[in-house]
Amino acid sequence: MVHLKALASGTLFASLASSAVISRQAAASINDAFVAHGKKYFGTCSDQALLQNSQNEAIVRADFGQLTPENSMKWDALEPSQGSFSFAGADFLADYAKTNNKLVRGHTLVWHSQLPSWVQGITDKDTLTEVIKNHITTIMQRYKGQIYAWDVVNEIFDEDGTLRDSVFSQVLGEDFVRIAFETAREADPNAKLYINDYNLDSADYAKTKGMVSYVKKWLDAGVPIDGIGSQSHYSANGFPVSGAKGALTALASTGVSEVAVTELDIEGASSESYLEVVNACLDVSSCVGITVWGVSDKDSWRSSTSPLLFDSNYQAKDAYNAIIDAL
């Protein structure tokens, strides 16, 4: 194992164009180390602007093996008005991933947030069903064969484990889940189909229990759910990282073929906390990978909490080095 001590140097990224820098980064790729332990990927999120940032892009290219579009594949970005699709941002990420041999997790097809008003205003069941089907089919067929997995539905549960109140549940009840997954399976039969949510960080929490119960029921009914994604946004006042393994084990108990940590960030980014989550995934056989929600703290949605593996100057933190050393 090549350790990553060199990444601690304050001059590491002084010349990102240098092939020597890229070589050193690649020799200590967190993705390569994780895959060597039998997992599919260790990835991050990005989009066009970040991939055109040379400092950010060099790290993505050298150190991560999977990309999730942070915003470019959400409904408001792809279909802002009915039947009018805008693929520029999503195409950029998909093309980058193909060129650089990165897996892609598509994110996300059906979500109550970042949803155009024209969708939110639908009240007719048949209309909403057709809108969901057309949206999913159009997007998934465009990227068929390029997207390893899709977050088909995202954040559909309340904290008590019941279905979230949204236009989808209001108009269609829980049947929108079946509609979405069946449409997705038909559009790209080889893509892994996920249900994704946050606060699934304790096996004993009501939301986790609700997810487990509903997914078991839907699987028994033949809904083609392949995986459960746990976003894993950890904060100082939230769930302890010590519950990660138990939570992933509970999610895996539903019978899905895969579980994954899909949007990991940890307030303070301590080495111990990151290692706890990495070890949790390593210890749960069906946990296929980890995606951290960004590269540098500078670009994080929680930048003030310094939650990522690279600081605001694109320097690898102790947590990154600790993971490499442990692997």
Curated annotation (Swiss-Prot):
Record-listed E.C. numbers: 3.2.1.8
Disulfide cross-links: C281-C287
GO CC entries: extracellular region
Pfam families noted in UniProt: Glyco_hydro_10
Location in the cell: Secreted
GH10 domain segment(s): 45-326
Metabolic or biological pathway, per its Swiss-Prot or TrEMBL entry: Glycan degradation; xylan degradation
Swiss-Prot/TrEMBL catalytic activity: Endohydrolysis of (1->4)-beta-D-xylosidic linkages in xylans
pH curve summary: Optimum pH is 5.0.
BP GO terms, sorted: xylan catabolic process
Signal peptide, first to last residue: 1-19
Protein name, as recorded: Endo-1,4-beta-xylanase F1
